[in-house]
Swiss-Prot record:
Disulfide bonds: none annotated. The chain crosses the membrane at residues 4-24, 27-47, 76-96, 99-116, 127-147, 150-170, 181-201, 208-228. Condenses choline with CDP-diglyceride to produce phosphatidylcholine and CMP. It is a multi-pass membrane protein. It comes from the Bacteria. Its cofactor is Mn(2+). One of its GO terms (biological process) is phospholipid biosynthetic process. It is an enzyme of class 2 (transferase). This is Phosphatidylcholine synthase. One of its GO terms (molecular function) is phosphatidylcholine synthase activity. Residues 1-3, 48-75, 117-126, 171-180, 229-234 are cytoplasmic.
């Protein structure tokens, strides 16, 4: 039984590391201009990152293989997929005005390095401290909704700045405050997100989906600012 558990534990690490393979093919798809493949690979990367931690805790991987730091492996994979690949995407694409590209890309790299190296990136009351480096979501939004350059410039600049500010960003699945509101609209937004990715929607439907997702992100931002003030004495 112990040998089986050990094999399963190693498989979890391999599963986490498979995100690096996804990252490699994501870079190749960017270079080849195959954004349809990039979109699917980005979603696969999000799925891997979303479940590998739960699997590791369930199988007690840390106890079985103490010589491998699963958290570090996960962070290496995440930095590549959540930060470095989006930087390549935005630098090589036409999603940001040319004169701002390098500044934005440097801002993304440095702000993410700051976030990933923080030991207090997540608070004790289940918030992200500062913008949580979800730059791959910008990749998805730009592929599906063809965001305007000025919209990208403004929103990405705000996210870079808030990476260094101790604002508490809602962790949708864990933050207790406003949970009864956050969970339902998160589920609805995710469903719309998935449908937008894997279905051929009309122009009108895409505009509606875009509006819903923008409102969702606006809610998360405004609610985070409000809750930062409300929980400031914790």
């Amino acid at each position: 039984m112990k040998n089986i558990n050990l094999i399963l534990a190693w498989l979890v690490h391999i599963f986490t590391a498979s995100g690096l393979i996804v990252g490699l093919y994501s870079i190749i798809s960017i270079v080849n201009g195959n954004y349809s493949l990039l979109l699917k690979l980005t979603v696969i990367g999000l799925i891997i990152d979303g479940i590998d931690g739960t699997m590791a805790r369930k199988l007690k991987v840390k106890e079985l293989i103490p010589e491998i730091d699963g958290t570090l492996l996960d962070n290496i994979t995440d930095y590549i997929n959540y930060t470095f690949i989006p930087v390549i995407f935005f630098y090589l694409g036409e999603f940001i005005e040319e004169k701002y590209k390098v500044a934005i890309c440097i801002g993304i790299l440095l702000s993410s390095a700051y976030q990933f190296s923080r030991t207090d990136a997540k608070t004790n009351d289940n918030y992200f401290r500062g913008f949580p480096s979800l730059w791959n979501l910008f990749v998805i939004l730009n592929i599906i909704f063809k965001m305007e350059q000025i919209t990208n410039l403004i929103t990405m600049s705000i996210c870079i700045i808030t990476s260094f500010i101790p604002i508490k960003f809602i962790y949708p699945s864990k933050t207790k405050e406003l949970r009864k509101i956050t969970i339902p609209i998160t589920i609805i937004s995710c469903l719309i997100f998935v449908v937008s990715i894997f279905s051929e929607l009309s122009t009108t439907a895409l505009k509606m989906a875009k509006t819903v997702l923008i409102l969702y992100f606006a809610y998360l931002t405004l609610a985070s600012i409000y809750l930062t003030y409300k929980t400031r004495n914790r």
